[in-house]
């Protein structure tokens, strides 16, 4: 059974790098440049994990995470950021 990852990051280089890394390990990837683009294709039957950038134009990663939780999403989520700090990390983990 193929594993799946959904990458949501506004930085194309990050999306490309993560796609290359994960696909080289046998993980199928779908990447999205924004939270809105991911939401346009998301449905509750998706399986795998979601990798979210914390800071994006438009809807942020934590905002997308909250919305997905409200919609009943049970997929594991990994947060990434190049601009993190301890309070931001604690806030994301508490949700």
Model-derived features: positions:
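Receiver (REC) domain active-site loop signature in two-component systems and cognate sites
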Residues: 56
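Short amphipathic alpha-helix used as the core "switch/output" element in two-component signaling
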Residues: 40, 62-73, 91
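Active-site residues of response regulator receiver
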Residues: 53, 81
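Short, conserved "switch-loop" micro-motifs in signal-transduction and mechanochemical regulators
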Residues: 71, 83-84
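Two-component/phosphorelay signaling modules centered on CheY-like receiver
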Residues: 12-30
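Active-site beta3 strand of CheY-like receiver
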Residues: 45-51
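Acidic catalytic/metal-coordinating carboxylates
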Residues: 33-34, 59-64, 84
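Short hydrophobic/Thr-rich beta-strand motif most characteristic of the beta2 strand and flanking loop
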Residues: 26-33, 41, 59
């Amino acid at each position: 059974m193929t594993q799946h990852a959904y990458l949501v990051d506004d930085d194309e280089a990050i999306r490309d790098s993560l796609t290359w890394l994960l696909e080289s390990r046998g993980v199928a990837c779908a990447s999205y440049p924004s939270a809105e683009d991911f939401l346009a294709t998301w449905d509750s039957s998706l399986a795998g994990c979601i990798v979210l950038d914390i800071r994006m134009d438009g809807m942020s990663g934590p905002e997308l995470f909250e919305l997905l939780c409200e919609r009943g999403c049970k997929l594991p989520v990994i947060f990434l950021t190049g601009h993190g700090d301890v309070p931001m990390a604690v806030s994301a983990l508490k949700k």
